[in-house]
């Protein structure tokens, strides 16, 4: 399971002209589900995402996690993160989880995030989405479990 996280001042996602989710300060989480992923991997990745200390403390040092910074999560499904780009000029998505399983684990990740007390907003699984964000930094990390 993969999360590409970006520290943002604000972010939103729109599907078919309707805003489905928005946050102020926090993390935009692009979430990719791979073959073989399960709830244990989702839990491990959420623990890493929610605990990752990439927000500045009072001394300007990256020392706070998203909760400590008073931020939220905007979780957006992103199957292209599971792409194999090693050969040719066209990505292969054979490493991605089957859509039914990917949606189940995406929903699980989102539910666990919300249950943890972090304000959590979402896009719509497998939809054509428009994501708007204001990067803060920019600060971007690839987390994979």
Swiss-Prot record:
Enzyme Commission code(s) on record: 3.1.1.96
Cysteine disulfide links: none
Residue ranges of the TM segments: none
GO biological process, one term: D-amino acid catabolic process
Any one Gene Ontology cellular component term annotated for this protein: cytoplasm
Catalytic activity: glycyl-tRNA(Ala) + H2O = tRNA(Ala) + glycine + H(+); a D-aminoacyl-tRNA + H2O = a tRNA + a D-alpha-amino acid + H(+)
Gene Ontology molecular functions: D-tyrosyl-tRNA(Tyr) deacylase activity; Gly-tRNA(Ala) deacylase activity; Ser(Gly)-tRNA(Ala) hydrolase activity; tRNA binding
Motif Gly-cisPro motif, important for rejection of L-amino acids, residue numbers: 137-138
Alphabetic keyword roster: Cytoplasm, Hydrolase, RNA-binding, tRNA-binding
Family matches, as SUPFAM superfamilies: DTD-like
Compartment(s): Cytoplasm
Record-linked Pfam families: Tyr_Deacylase
Domain writeup: A Gly-cisPro motif from one monomer fits into the active site of the other monomer to allow specific chiral rejection of L-amino acids.
Subunit text: Homodimer.
Similarity field: Belongs to the DTD family.
Its biological purpose: An aminoacyl-tRNA editing enzyme that deacylates mischarged D-aminoacyl-tRNAs. Also deacylates mischarged glycyl-tRNA(Ala), protecting cells against glycine mischarging by AlaRS. Acts via tRNA-based rather than protein-based catalysis; rejects L-amino acids rather than detecting D-amino acids in the active site. By recycling D-aminoacyl-tRNA to D-amino acids and free tRNA molecules, this enzyme counteracts the toxicity associated with the formation of D-aminoacyl-tRNA entities in vivo and helps enforce protein L-homochirality.
Stated name of the protein: D-aminoacyl-tRNA deacylase
Organism of this sequence: Aeromonas hydrophila subsp. hydrophila (strain ATCC 7966 / DSM 30187 / BCRC 13018 / CCUG 14551 / JCM 1027 / KCTC 2358 / NCIMB 9240 / NCTC 8049)
